[in-house]
Amino acid sequence: MRYQRPKGTADILPGDSEKWQYVEATARAVFKTYQFKEIRTPMFENFEVFSRSAGDTSDIVTKEMYDFHDKGDRHITLRPEGTAGVVRAFVENKLYGPQVLKPYKVYYMGPMFRYERPQSGRLREFHQLGVEAFGSESAALDVEVIAMGYNLLKTFGLTDLKLVINTLGDQQTRDDYRQALIDYLEPHFDELSDDSKERLHKNPLRVLDSKAPEDQQFVADAPSILDYLSPEAQAHFDQTKTYLDALAIPYEIDATMVRGLDYYNHTIFEIMTHSKALGKGYTTICAGGRYNGLVKELGGPEVSGVGFGLGVERLLVLMDAENIAVPTDDQLDVYVVGIGDTASATTLKLVQALRAAGYKAERDYLDRKPKAQFKSADRLNARYTMTVGETELADQVVNLKAMATGEETKVAMADIYQDAHQVLDK
């Protein structure tokens, strides 16, 4: 039997893993400047955490979640997105209390799981970077989160970016708009897709998110939520636009954008890019928004939140397509060449001493001839070689060679053990 990875998953091998490390390290550095700190939550949660947060009619809950009953008959779900687990942790650990500074800012990174058709940059096990900020209803925080996502993508070298925003308003806005949508769509009920028929009276806003061809003409002509904003919702949206203008971040407004999760309200946004690597036209690379009711939905008090998620696989596909070079630090500092069996213990001691001093060091483990060892040093792009043979052992020295110049010197082993930096950093 041939064992293969499950469909929709990927092995991240050396050569690629360095790109992931770069993305994660860069994101951490950017998040740190905004005073966001890392949170780590379980990769699986109780089913209700996601069914309550994402919405019973969302594609995630109805079609895409990996859920099962464990041996204790608990209904468990592999996390399909990051926000709900973070909100659950926020509530369970009482981080909404007055003893915790607000806004409470956290970021996460790690694998998520959705049962969907694998395609370029979209897998069943995929990885997200995300941020969440709790405890402020200010539109300035919405814009800070948007700016952070926008600047992060620019830091990665992406240039053809488009920010699209919308508002889902407050509860009054959504109640009024919900009824307007039902009134508009009901006469066309028989022409809607099966999914949209099912959603029409449960959550008509989900119809606007439909990708079914038969729904597109109705989505295009649907009433605009912008015509149903309450004064408070209008003021929040106006402030958001004012702050974006102040930061000189260009944006477009798409009144049909609703996002794929039911917990959003007020500001929602998507940052898109135009790349053939992800298909025709603009595709979303980073998305998020405000969710003022989610903390209460998961058992906490009325505390507002705002955040975004960013797909790492899609980001890396884009970076490859744009030929964006990822900085690497894979040069070996020292390759220790051993000649003869008697040198083996000494070469092992030398590489350990070099590593303890902070250098990247390697030796041979295949009992090869010196010529083959020097070839390995070349392939590993070593800065130096240290050669130890019978003569060097007798004199307790190594033959140190600078690979760039070919210059060779004799160095006492004691000097290396005592202070390798004095030897290598002259």
UniProtKB/Swiss-Prot annotation:
GO CC aspect terms: cytoplasm
One record GO biological process: histidyl-tRNA aminoacylation
InterPro entries documented for this protein: aa-tRNA-synth_II, aa-tRNA-synth_II/BPL/LPL, Anticodon-bd, Anticodon-bd_dom_sf, His-tRNA-ligase, HisRS-like_core, HisRS/HisZ, HisRS_anticodon
Taxonomy, superkingdom: Bacteria
Pfam families associated with the record: HGTP_anticodon, tRNA-synt_His
Stored SUPFAM superfamilies: Class II aaRS ABD-related (SSF52954), Class II aaRS and biotin synthetases (SSF55681)
Listed Gene3D superfamilies: Anticodon-binding domain, Bira Bifunctional Protein, Domain 2
A GO MF term: histidine-tRNA ligase activity
Catalytic activity: tRNA(His) + L-histidine + ATP = L-histidyl-tRNA(His) + AMP + diphosphate + H(+)
EC number in record: 6.1.1.21
Enzyme class: ligase
Keywords, ordered alphabetically: Aminoacyl-tRNA synthetase, ATP-binding, Cytoplasm, Ligase, Nucleotide-binding, Protein biosynthesis
Subcellular location: Cytoplasm
Similarity comment: Belongs to the class-II aminoacyl-tRNA synthetase family.
Subunit structure, as described in the record: Homodimer.
HAMAP family in the cross-refs: His_tRNA_synth
Full protein name: Histidine--tRNA ligase
Lineage, opening ranks: Bacteria, Bacillati, Bacillota, Bacilli, Lactobacillales
